[in-house]
From Swiss-Prot:
Its job: Acts as an activator of both rRNA/tRNA and protein methyltransferases. Together with methyltransferase mtq2, required for the methylation of eRF1 on 'Gln-182'. Together with methyltransferase trm11, required for the formation of 2-methylguanosine at position 10 (m2G10) in tRNA. Together with methyltransferase bud23, required for the formation of a 7-methylguanine in 18S rRNA. Involved in biogenesis of both 40S and 60S ribosomal subunits.
Location in the cell: Cytoplasm; Nucleus
Domain TRM112 per the UniProt entry, residue ranges: 2-122
Protein family according to the UniProt entry: Belongs to the TRM112 family.
Name of the molecule in the record: Multifunctional methyltransferase subunit trm112
Subunit structure: Heterodimer of mtq2-trm112, forming the eRF1 methyltransferase. Trm112 is necessary for the solubility and activity of the catalytic subunit mtq2. Interacts with trm11; required for full tRNA methyltransferase activity. Interacts with bud23; required for full rRNA methyltransferase activity. Interacts with rcm1, nop2, trm9 and lys9.
One CC-aspect GO term: tRNA (m2G10) methyltransferase complex
Organism in which the protein naturally occurs: Schizosaccharomyces pombe (strain 972 / ATCC 24843) (Fission yeast)
GO MF term list: protein heterodimerization activity; tRNA methyltransferase activator activity
A Pfam family recorded for this sequence: Trm112p
Amino acid sequence: MKLLTANFLNCSNKKCTSSPEAFPLDVVDAKLAIQQLELKPEFLIGIMPRIDWNALLKTTRQLGNYSLPDEKPDLVDDSDEVLLKSLHNVLLETEITEGKMVCGNCGHVYPIFEGIPNMLLSESEI
């Protein structure tokens, strides 16, 4: 699962939909892989408005990556090549292959196996 995907996932439990603690999910016991991909500045510029920067920072720091700036950058063109490469590496090349995502509100654990998060809840948790 790419970190870009993790930036859009939250707890599926109805009790958690209105809780700010349910997003982002905490990433624990993660195994990471880096997959080299072609840099596409236009994609990064287009996706940046949809990125929850604070959630992304929390996730990357839980994974030991401190390469992103504290403040969300204004990415309006491809002139900042260093920033583009850093975002590309974090959002698109870094993958969580194994691990868990944990809801900070209800504590539900979503396992990640072979890069795929299991976001299903049992009937009693819905």
